[in-house]
Design a protein with these regions (language model features):
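Hydrophobic core
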Residues: 10, 14-16
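Catalytic glutamate of the conserved HExxH
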Residues: 386, 390, 394, 398, ...
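Short pre-active-site segment immediately N-terminal to the catalytic Zn-binding motif
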Residues: 368-387
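A well-structured
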Residues: 25-319, 323, 481
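C-terminal, non-catalytic "cap/extension" segments appended to globular domains
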Residues: 37, 387, 450, 454, ...
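Post-HExxH zinc-binding segment in Zn-dependent metallohydrolases
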Residues: 292, 297-298, 400, 405-446, ...
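Catalytic zinc-binding patch centered on the HExxH motif and its immediate surroundings
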Residues: 348-370
Length: 581
């Protein structure tokens, strides 16, 4: 049994990160935009030309005032715009001006929702932001329906062609010629139900506590103070006894809700829906399942034989950010420019607190055109990789104004920056070597764990309702852990219930395959950098400008990188890791 893997799987946080890029459902025409020229050296964030300007001026995050959005007013305005478009009296220019103002309010609604979530996860005991986050979540389907109704009404109006020509773009309304997602009351109810279940899961994570030796204690504190492995696992067992059934029932309801939702939207399975509507993938669930099987057969044996890295050295939050700054200065280009922007507007939180939600993510405050990094640190060198990962998302969000729609493309930048950070800091020879070995082992482990998670999801969503029980889910997860070499059969029973801590299962179904395929692409960037210094960094920068509105395989082709689905690619990866580890 791999002790490190066991600790990772059982930790009360995500294995990698809870990345949550939010997508702009409407993209105005990108104005005249050219790639900045770094041939003369560094470019300040003040001089860097971004594709879009903020709707609200750049503001340091602590100074942003949260204001509950006027949803009633927004929905009423959108309805009025639709009526004006079909009334026959308003000119296209008038409709455009009204819609442009309403769209600013729509974006502000999404921004305030993200701000509420950010501030709630920063302090899960904050009842005000918990209530605001819940309220914004509850209002989302109502707002989206109002926006969809407005688009549908404009699509049926005599101004359709003029609106497309002057503002929306060619064939924009084509997707609104048929009934929309929010026109069906049951679909709306299912979306609301999914949001409510996700909120229940987040609340369940709010510093879970258990009865221990006659009094109530925080699980995280008990685990932190466990002096022996036996005591550590005993605490975990008590935690799963207390929370496993609750989380499991939430997940079962999510699966049932999502399967019905996919069916109502015309998809054969929820995987088909997620690939098409959520993640904009240009490969199929069938391709992903074959890929995961090759991970199992080719990489699991390598992982079983690989030597585990030593326990990582300690690293404070201040040191983590210091080294991340060094890496940005060393790498230069867009990475350095984005770091200047991050510092100028205080766009990160890496503080340590028992009240913070575990894990890390990068979000986007769209009204301000500002990415934001959230990290709950562990206090080791691993935090530098986590920070680099999230900063990779930040760089992409900053350069492209959040227009990288593909999850897989987005994850290439986050994982590639982890690799590029290796050797770009003043850690010293010993700690740099320690971090590199850890990263390569972690990379191999990423393939196995995320493929394991994906296989579990596929099996869970395939279960008929009669077999969809918490006990069956535990059994399936244990089987997957054994199949992918993460545990032997004797140890799998201990890990069987740990799936409830994988937040992606609850908040981002079928997401985890992105970690596998993007890790492959990111590793290719690292290999380029190792072969020819600067080549990997150039590939990273080139891909940044290929990513907006692209898809994963198309972006890799633009960058002359090998597809992860190439038949020989998994054998190449196995050979690489055998030599590296």
């Amino acid at each position: 049994m791999k002790k490190r893997c066991f600790a990772l799987l059982l930790a009360l946080s995500l294995l990698l990160t809870g990345c949550s890029p939010l997508f702009d459902l409407y993209s105005a025409a990108r104005g005249e935009y050219t790639r900045p020229d770094y041939s003369d050296g560094a470019i300040s964030y003040r001089e860097f030309q971004r594709p879009y300007q903020p709707r609200v001026k750049y503001t340091a995050e602590p100074d942003i005032e949260y204001v509950r959005p006027d949803v009633d007013g927004l929905c009423s305005t959108l309805k009025s715009i639709g009526a004006s478009a079909t009334g026959g009296k308003a000119a296209a220019a008038d409709i455009i001006n009204q819609f442009d103002a309403a769209y600013d309010d729509y974006v502000l609604f999404n921004t305030m929702g993200e701000l509420a979530y950010l501030r709630y996860t920063r302090d899960l005991s904050d009842s005000y932001y918990e209530a605001e986050y819940t309220w914004c979540t509850d209002q989302t389907t109502r707002v989206e329906k109002a926006m969809e109704d407005c688009y549908t009404t404009m699509a049926k109006s005599s101004l359709r062609s003029a609106l497309e020509e002057q503002y929306f773009g060619e064939d924009f309304f084509a997707s609104y010629d048929s009934d929309g997602v929010y026109s069906d009351a049951r679909t709306v109810a299912l979306l609301q139900q999914e949001s409510e279940l996700q909120a229940q899961y987040v609340a369940l994570q709010n510093d879970p506590a258990i009865e221990w030796n006659g009094s109530t204690h925080s699980v995280s504190e008990l685990l932190e103070n466990a002096v022996t492995a036996d005591l550590y696992y005993e605490v975990l067992g008590a935690y799963y006894d207390a929370y496993g059934a609750q989380a499991g029932e939430i997940y079962i309801k999510l699966i049932q809700t999502r399967r019905e939702l996919a069916g109502r939207l015309g998809y054969g399975s929820y995987a088909d829906y997620a690939y098409d509507a959520l993640y904009y993938r240009d490969y199929t669930p069938a391709q992903a399942e074959r890929y995961v099987e090759r991970v199992r057969t080719e990489l699991a044996p390598v992982y079983t034989e690989a030597a585990e890295p030593m326990q990582l050295s300690a690293l404070s939050a201040d040191e983590t950010m210091q080294h991340l700054h060094e890496a940005a200065d060393t790498l230069g280009g867009e990475v350095q420019t984005a770091m200047g922007f991050l510092d100028a507007y205080s766009l990160y939180d890496i503080t340590s607190s028992a009240n913070k939600m575990p894990g890390s993510y990068t979000t986007y405050l769209e009204s301000y055109e500002m990415p934001y990094i959230y990290i709950s640190p562990e206090g080791t060198l691993a935090d530098l990789l986590t920070a680099a990962h999230e900063f990779g998302h930040f760089v992409d969000g900053y350069v492209n104004c959040n227009q990288t729609f593909s999850i897989d493309c987005s994850e290439v930048f986050s994982q590639a920056l982890e690799y590029l950070t290796l050797g770009s800091t003043s850690l010293g020879f010993s700690r740099a070597a320690e971090l590199r070995q850890y990263k390569l082992y972690d990379s191999l482990e990423t393939f196995l764990t995320q493929a394991c998670y994906y296989a579990f999801e596929c099996k869970a969503y395939a279960l008929p309702d009669s077999e969809l029980t918490v006990g069956k889910l535990n059994e399936l997860f244990a089987e997957c852990c054994v199949d992918f070499g993460l545990f032997d059969e004797a140890s799998a029973e201990q890990a069987a219930r740990s799936w409830i801590d994988v937040q992606h299962f609850f908040s981002a179904p079928y997401y985890v395959i992105s970690y596998c395929v993007s890790n492959d692409a990111a590793l290719q960037i690292y290999q380029l950098e190792q072969e020819t210094p600067g080549a990997g960094l150039k590939a990273f920068s080139d891909l940044l400008y290929a990513a907006p509105e692209s898809t994963f395989l198309a972006m890799l082709q633009d960058g002359s990188l090998t597809s992860p689905f190439d038949e020989s690619r998994m054998q190449d990866l196995a050979a690489y890791f055998k030599e590296a580890l």
